[in-house]
């Protein structure tokens, strides 16, 4: 008999984000051997049901948001209708945690804790009790890196039930060699390309990367959207790097940009960047990484001196030095890029992630026999 799994997420693709990519990878691979459904928030004030990636995806009616958390009053009812053996909750997601507790669903609970809840203290006082209650009820909590587990306040009381399962990606779309599209990008922007991808929000640290470009002989392509766009445009002008830095906004197909680039930079400044899926995509494309030494999984994914270079956060000078070292040393850049691709294939593939998650499911199910 197939294991029945219900995923509770914040959103599901085409919404973009690291958690959404992770959820889609699990759903796509698990649906080949399990009965998989997912309940997430919708953009609309009505519920929509779709069949995607081999699974039933229910996007429940959403009535606004509080501190970026969607308000989904009917989610508990939808959870209650599920016959799942395992409920897999993806946090931070206080609304889904509350809905699950309110539903009284009897299934075994597994949580993937992507990051600690961020936000105003007043809202945390409301949300923390039921997030904690969900963790107390959980049979196991998946954490994506040892470093994040060690630094997490929310997980401090639950370390005995935590399991380290790194995120994984489908490496195939990024494994191709240079393409016509990537050649066109290099023709348009130049040969010494630096790429960075992410939402334009404070913890990403993009202002420090822009500042570093004052001392870099190359071109930065910054892909992503967010409310800091105007502020970053001002930063570009103040640093007089208009000819070196291009804000590209949303890009439908990011793979050619990875292939066209010489270096990928993840300049995040806080542990809100828990893992950095985009750096795995860049590594799968065979390019070296410049990342920052923050207390999360970021420097565990791309290791300093092995697959890239790690520098202190909020340090434009160190960023510039690392970028220049890689741009000016073809041999080092190629060696680190090749090692980066191998590391992702060996340790961070979607297949490896799904395999480890299934093993945990089976352990949890065996406990109830």
Model-identified regions with their sequence ranges:
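N-terminal strand-loop element at the rim of the active site
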Residues: 7-16, 21-67
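Short hydrophobic beta-strand element within catalytic cores of glycosyltransferases
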Residues: 288-292, 302
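Donor nucleotide-sugar binding/catalytic pocket of nucleotide-sugar-dependent glycosyltransferases
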Residues: 131-179
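An aromatic- and histidine-rich active-site surface loop
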Residues: 73-75, 86-106, 118
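A conserved mid-protein helix/loop that constitutes part of the nucleotide-sugar donor-binding site
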Residues: 21, 192-215, 227-233, 317-318, ...
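Active-site donor-binding acidic/aromatic loop of nucleotide-activated sugar
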Residues: 228-231, 242-251, 257, 309-310
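Acidic donor-binding loop of glycosyltransferase active sites
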Residues: 259-274, 287
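Conserved acidic donor-binding segment of nucleotide-sugar-dependent glycosyltransferases
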Residues: 303-305, 309-316, 325-331
């Amino acid at each position: 008999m197939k294991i029945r799994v219900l995923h509770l997420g914040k959103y599901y693709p085409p919404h973009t984000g690291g958690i959404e990519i992770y959820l889609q990878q699990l759903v796509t691979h698990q649906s080949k051997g399990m009965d998989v459904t997912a309940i997430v928030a919708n953009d609309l004030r009505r519920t929509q049901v779709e069949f995607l990636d081999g699974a039933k995806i229910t996007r429940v009616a959403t009535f606004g948001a509080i501190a970026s958390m969607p308000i989904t009053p009917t989610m508990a009812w939808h959870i209650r209708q599920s016959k799942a053996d395992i409920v897999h909750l993806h946090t931070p997601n206080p609304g889904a945690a509350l809905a699950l507790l309110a539903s009284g669903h009897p299934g075994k609970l597994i949580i993937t804790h992507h990051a600690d809840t961020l936000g105003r203290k007043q809202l945390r006082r409301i949300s923390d009790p039921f997030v904690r209650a969900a963790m107390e009820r959980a049979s196991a909590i998946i954490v994506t890196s040892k470093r994040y587990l060690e630094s997490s306040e929310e997980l401090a009381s639950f370390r005995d039930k935590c399991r380290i399962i790194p995120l994984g990606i489908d490496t195939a779309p990024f494994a191709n060699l240079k393409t016509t599209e990537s050649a066109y990008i290099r023709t348009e922007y130049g040969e010494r390309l630096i790429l960075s991808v992410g939402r334009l929000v404070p913890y990403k640290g993009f202002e420090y990367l822009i500042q570093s470009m004052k001392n870099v002989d190359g071109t930065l392509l910054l892909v992503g959207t967010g409310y800091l766009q105007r502020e970053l445009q001002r930063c570009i002008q103040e640093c007089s790097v208009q000819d070196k830095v291009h804000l590209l906004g949303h890009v439908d197909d990011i793979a050619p940009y990875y292939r066209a680039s010489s270096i990928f930079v993840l300049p995040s400044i806080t542990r809100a960047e828990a893992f950095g899926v985009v750096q795995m995509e860049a590594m799968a494309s065979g390019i070296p990484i410049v990342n920052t030494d923050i207390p999360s999984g970021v420097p565990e994914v791309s290791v300093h001196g092995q697959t890239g270079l790690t520098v202190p956060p909020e340090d434009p000078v160190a960023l510039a030095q690392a970028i220049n070292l890689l741009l000016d040393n073809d041999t080092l850049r190629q060696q680190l890029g090749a090692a980066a691709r191998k590391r992702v294939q060996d340790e961070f593939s979607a297949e490896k992630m799904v395999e480890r998650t299934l093993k945990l499911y089976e352990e949890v199910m065996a406990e109830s026999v």
